[in-house]
Amino acid sequence: MKGIKKSPTEESLYLEYSHQTEGCIFPLHTSVTLFLLSYCECKVFNVCLVLTEESTDTSDTSFLKEALPQDLEIQVISKQALPPIVQNCCLPAVVDQPDVFCRAGLAVVLRHIIQKSYEAEPSRKEILELLGFKKTCLKACAEVSQWTRLCELTIPLAVENFLQESSEHPPTIPEEILELERKLSEPVRVHNDDKLRRQKLKQQKAAGSEPPSGKGKAKSKASAQKTPKDLAAPSKSLELKVAFSKLTVQEDAAASNREPSHIRKAKAADLPPLEHVFAEGLYFTLADIVLLPCIHHFLVIICKKFSEKLEQFPLLTSWYQRIQEVPKVKTAASKCGIYFLYLPELLNSARKQPVNSDEVAAVDEQSDPLFIGGPRPTMTKLMEKGIEAMFSPHPCPAWTLDWSSLPAAVSPKEGKMSTDRALRKQQQLNNLVYLVLNQAKPGDRIVDFCSGGGHVGIVLAHMLPSCQVTLIENKELSLIRAKKRSDELGLSNIWFIQANMEYFTGMFNIGVALHACGVATDMVIEHCIQTRASFITCPCCYGFIQNTSKFNFPKSEKFKKTLSYKEHMLLCRFADQTAVQLPPERRLIGKQCMGLVDLDRAAAAGEHGYSVQVISMEPESCSPKNNMIVGVPL
């Protein structure tokens, strides 16, 4: 391990180092990233290990010798040596030269490592396959994706806490591990689900075993007694055949044969469910890469101190044994100090209990009841409590930027959209820019959340050269387009961060968001409140609003006292019905529902010491979603 000089085009990868416990590097995000680098044999990054404030001495690195891949050159630095843009983000993070474009957060960074590794070695198709079907594995943020939340947040944190607690006293098994065990018992859903299930039915018929009948009812005795060893035999599992044929780049010969009539005519409800081979289903993906270091270190402690608890995780241990068969996994693991355990066969406990889809459907129906009727009873209920949609007057409805005098790259027309749409986008920007210009002071830091192609942020950076503007967006291509426009303008007061907004930890004065989808608007407002920053948001996609791990609706006390969650969801559903092709009366109801949903948001922010207004954009025709929520700390 030694210092490395950065080339002008090289990207730097920054990983946090806190400490080691039981041979595991903390935080686990770093262990996971190092394992992926080892699996991909990736050498395209300048890798920097960032010591925490508790251990800032970078001269003595002997304690790291056994913990890091020895074929990977690593530079050890202190937090103070991080580029300014990285100091505003959670690690891991990757930065392009000249330190104005940053990718932060585990999922974003891992996906970028995969893409760069494949670009460096296109012959290794298995690297790109880690991104899964349509290349979407761990692409969605943790707020909307169960797997991203599990892999990026809950499992690493739960295992870290488990490892720390186990050194002092017998810990309890993390609920997150039990949740993962349950998820491995659920039927697999893949894009060619029906085809594979019919192949499995054919296989079972040929073997003389009866498939489960109707909607996930109990499996046959032969199927129920399947052990981990059975699952490791490709001749006995269609799922394994499919999974490992993909890993070895072979074609499944059965796929080209036309199925017999009785197989083709079988009802979908009578088809056997597909079982997990890997974490997300049949294929080895990035999710498995993330989970392996976490689950390995968890199982090490279980086997060493609480071996009697091992039988609680038959599916997890089967997955752990199976993943060792994936080419190059053992080699990559050993380079990272991960030496696989030998786990005894759990003959009795490894029996898989099928998920009863009738029960699942019943639970779903209870947790997500059907919407019945319109919003009028809910609106009347609010009116009886003195709550109505109220809009503050626009402070300057006729104000507009002189778009003709601005450089072409500032205009939304440069964002590859039609002339009509570009005009409406300009009208939307007029509203947000006016409000920001009225609040911004020289030296202020402005953050454009959910920035997309950078329409808001680029205009603000051009109009406010004395302010630092940061664009935060989860979609890489959108942010790359924004940077290209910024480069054409020669802007020097702008940063680009590809990350979920919670991984931005910097201080700022004003937060803006144009058409942040669903709960993203609530996340923006929450982020601004935590920093005591002003906010100007224009919500969108009201129909996607739902309770999450961070938010419960309604949000404000006065709405909570009046409406149930279901009634609030009813307002959200109808708030989305404002499209121009709808009848005027329906659009009016939609606008009122929008106003009520945003009034709840405004009231909740007011409870945190903000002066908040809900204002309609001018002209209102600039967008069906034309509300603005404007908040200033008192």
UniProtKB/Swiss-Prot annotation:
One of its GO terms (biological process) is response to lipopolysaccharide. Keywords: Cytoplasm. This is Glutathione S-transferase C-terminal domain-containing protein. Pfam families: GST_C_3, Methyltransf_32. One of its GO terms (cellular component) is cytoplasm. The keyword Mitochondrion does not apply. Signal peptide: none annotated. Residues 204-226 have a biased composition (Low complexity). It is found in: Cytoplasm. The lineage of its organism: Eukaryota, Metazoa, Chordata, Craniata, Vertebrata. It comes from the Eukaryota. Residues 189-233 are annotated as: Disordered. Belongs to the GSTCD family. It comes from Mus musculus (Mouse). Residues 131-333 form the GST C-terminal domain. The keyword Hydrolase does not apply. PROSITE patterns: GST_CTER.
